[in-house]
From Swiss-Prot:
It catalyses: N-(5-phospho-beta-D-ribosyl)anthranilate = 1-(2-carboxyphenylamino)-1-deoxy-D-ribulose 5-phosphate. It comes from the Bacteria. The gene is trpF. Transmembrane segments: none annotated. Pathway: Amino-acid biosynthesis; L-tryptophan biosynthesis; L-tryptophan from chorismate: step 3/5. It is an enzyme of class 5 (isomerase). Keywords: Amino-acid biosynthesis, Aromatic amino acid biosynthesis, Isomerase, Tryptophan biosynthesis. This is N-(5'-phosphoribosyl)anthranilate isomerase. Pfam families: PRAI. Its EC number is 5.3.1.24.
Amino acid sequence: MNRSLYRTRIKFCGMTRAGDIRLAGELGVDAVGFIFAHGSPRRVAPAEARAMRQATAPMVDVVALFRNNSKEEVREVVRTVRPTLLQFHGEEEDAFCRSFNLPYLKAVPMGSTGVNGEDANARTLQLSYPNTAGFLFDSHAPGAGGGTGKTFDWSRLPTGLHRPFLLAGGINAGNVFDAIVATLPWGVDVSSGVELAPGIKDGHKMRKFVEEVRRADCHEMS
């Protein structure tokens, strides 16, 4: 990949405040995420997300995150929030994920038990999710939620993927430079790494995170 023509995309997830969304836009973040997964401390109601969506800057994607939600719940979010991208963290199959007529990302759990007890395999992932827009590799274990603040062994990322991938799990301003240099992801997804508390973002951490991503991009161009 020619890194001179490339920049790492940035997604801030777990948004719960309009002010944080506005700052994300000012910082040039590519996407903001709302969480609708049951049990998440960052979960918001569709009506809340719809109101906060008004703070989104032009050309910033709005991502809706689910984990084993019902089809009716996903449809309500699609209708109410009008996201541009869906993200699934549960046991959802490809047919379910693509049934909402929106592009989607499939999260792959890379916690201590890996994917069904084994490391992720590019061929298996792509055969299982042929219609995904990309994969997101996170540090949580299968069946668990993200936002743990823990990293995973980046050397376990599968090789040979023909889809873009995002790196998540324990990323913050202190390690995102090394993460990008080591894995060359299409994008990085951060939640707890730019927070004061679950769902409450910190402006200084947000700004520093973006600066470190851009520093990594410049490093790869040199």
